[in-house]
Amino acid sequence: NPCCDAATCKLKSGSQCGHGDCCEQCKFSKSGTECRASMSECDPAEHCTGQSSECPADVFHKNGQPCLDNYGYCYNGNCPIMYHQCYDLFGADVYEAEDSCFERNQKGNYYGYCRKENGNKIPCAPEDVKCGRLYCKDNSPGQNNPCKMFYSNEDEHKGMVLPGTKCADGKVCSNRQ
């Protein structure tokens, strides 16, 4: 390390730092230098203070703050919305399904449920139908599936609406409710 004296294991004269995201050429990075990029609208970038070699702690916007033009709410640094979840599962031209598809989550069967207890699929309460299985509308060429869903025996959570997803105005899914 060019900033340190190997014989003494101390910083060389004139050096402010020897490592860190906010250490450049043995000096603290200038105040305002980005040291951690934003990962989403709910996770602002962090910047060096000019007083330390370390990047400040990773902070997120408060859970529940509206994001993506009110399509979602911040949740642990992300803005989970059903459109993105459908895209991640199925790719382009797939969108959140109509509300009628989510009504299937009241059945408590393979096609729709909110959670499992002792291996049994528990139906969603009417107000929680958008917190169970995720339904997507497939508009890709040659497809006409208005209530597309994903099921995996290996990962029972894949294909379910993610925690923190907006399910109604002012409401998000938590514990599949």
UniProtKB/Swiss-Prot annotation:
Domain of life of the organism encoding this protein: Eukaryota
In its record, the post-translational modification comment is: Glycosylated.
Cross-referenced SUPFAM superfamilies: Blood coagulation inhibitor (disintegrin)
User: Keywords on this record?
Assistant: Calcium, Disulfide bond, Glycoprotein, Hemostasis impairing toxin, Hydrolase, Metal-binding, Metalloprotease, Protease, Secreted, Toxin, Zinc
InterPro entries recorded for this chain?
Answer: ADAM_Cys-rich, Disintegrin_CS, Disintegrin_dom, Disintegrin_dom_sf
UniProt EC number: 3.4.24.-
Cellular location(s): Secreted
For this entry, list what GO says about its biological process: proteolysis
Where this protein primarily resides, as one coarse class?
secreted
- Tell me the residue numbers annotated for binding Ca(2+): 43-44, 46, 58-59
**Enzyme class, first EC level, given as a word:** hydrolase
Where does the motif D/ECD-tripeptide lie? 41-43
State the Pfam families in the record.
ADAM_CR, Disintegrin
Q: Is Hydrolase set as a keyword in this record?
A: yes
Cofactor details (free text): Binds 1 zinc ion per subunit.
User: Where is it found, in Gene Ontology cellular component terms?
Assistant: extracellular region; plasma membrane
Q: Does the keyword Secreted apply?
A: yes
Cofactors needed by this protein, per the record, are: Zn(2+)
Q: Which PANTHER family match?
A: ADAM A DISINTEGRIN AND METALLOPROTEASE DOMAIN, DISINTEGRIN AND METALLOPROTEINASE DOMAIN-CONTAINING PROTEIN 28
Its quaternary organisation is: Monomer.
* Similarity section: Belongs to the venom metalloproteinase (M12B) family. P-III subfamily. P-IIIa sub-subfamily.
* Record's function text: Snake venom metalloproteinase that impairs hemostasis in the envenomed animal.
Task: Please give the name of this protein.
Answer: Zinc metalloproteinase-disintegrin-like scutiarin
